[in-house]
Amino acid sequence: MDEKRLTHLRQLEAESIHIIREVAAEFGNPVMLYSIGKDSSVMLHLARKAFFPGNLPFPLLHVDTGWKFREMYEFRDHTAKAFGCELLVHRNPEGVAMGINPFVHGSAKHTDIMKTEGLKQALNKYGFDAAFGGARRDEEKSRAKERIYSFRDRFHRWDPKNQRPELWHNYNGQINKGESIRVFPLSNWTELDIWQYIFLEKIDIVPLYLAKPRPVVERDGMLLMVDDDRIDLQPGEVITQKMVRFRTLGCWPLTGAVESEAQTLPAIIEEMLISTTSERQGRMIDRDQSGSMELKKRQGYF
């Protein structure tokens, strides 16, 4: 890695650590949202650096849908134990009672009930006034215009027309009772930055990011990995083995794999250098309707 690139990554690292420390000092009850993906792994690594040699001064929160990949659950539990992190797991009990299923109810309803409502329930339950998230501006257009300190009203809603200025790395965290801030320390990182930093810092990631033969079924132009026996095969669908990996991770029935031979981090970085598509193309929830991500964020989504 050349010196300019290394300096760029260290500048991003310093900015993110500064933001994380600012939140810890400014807010009374912060939490780090931990979705188990590559961005969460980088964000957790930065947080551990920010407070080393001490422990994290806030817990991790995983909003569980019951439909994550099995390897994600294993990685989550191993990581929390290895780093001595307090891990809070919340699953929407109302959604569980309703039997919400992405195959039956679709991506929009599943995401709204199990993710958006589940997140709001957890934030209310524990009274968190700030929540770190791993979103980046290069991922999607609504995230591109969101501030690092993203103000949310008492219903956890985001108003893109009512955002606060952030000049010269000054962040306004003033809130009234019931309001909160979503904080995005990785806002200025790109997908390539993330992968190069993971390689540089030797950060552990879920093995699903690396290519290997996996059972998949093609549906709506996406390759869905068959992770357990809850798969709902449609007429004419056949499970086949393909060499695939994931650029983004979510609920397995709603996350598409990509055909790839990249079995190592350097190989992934090579792919990123020539990629012309967003990693979010593998998320079915982004295809619900035009502007679906912004609509979800207005309703309280991550």
Swiss-Prot record:
Sorted alphabetically, the Gene Ontology BP terms of this entry are: hydrogen sulfide biosynthetic process; sulfate assimilation
Instruction: Please verify whether the record's keywords include Transmembrane.
Output: no
Reactions listed under catalytic activity: sulfate + ATP + H(+) = adenosine 5'-phosphosulfate + diphosphate
Top-tier EC class? transferase
- UniProtKB keywords: ATP-binding, Nucleotide-binding, Nucleotidyltransferase, Transferase
Q: Transferase as a keyword? A: yes
The annotated pathway is: Sulfur metabolism; hydrogen sulfide biosynthesis; sulfite from sulfate: step 1/3
Q: What is its EC number?
A: 2.7.7.4
Q: List the Gene Ontology MF annotations in alphabetical order.
A: ATP binding; sulfate adenylyltransferase (ATP) activity
Matches recorded under InterPro entries? PAPS_reduct_dom, Rossmann-like_a/b/a_fold, SO4_adenylTrfase_ssu, Sulfate_adenylyltrnsfr_sub2
Q: Which residues cross the membrane?
A: none
> One Pfam family from the UniProt entry?
PAPS_reduct
Subunit architecture: Heterodimer composed of CysD, the smaller subunit, and CysN.
Family membership, please give it: Belongs to the PAPS reductase family. CysD subfamily.
- Function recorded in the entry: With CysN forms the ATP sulfurylase (ATPS) that catalyzes the adenylation of sulfate producing adenosine 5'-phosphosulfate (APS) and diphosphate, the first enzymatic step in sulfur assimilation pathway. APS synthesis involves the formation of a high-energy phosphoric-sulfuric acid anhydride bond driven by GTP hydrolysis by CysN coupled to ATP hydrolysis by CysD.
Q: What is this protein called?
A: Sulfate adenylyltransferase subunit 2
Q: What is the lineage of its organism?
A: Bacteria, Pseudomonadati, Pseudomonadota, Gammaproteobacteria, Enterobacterales
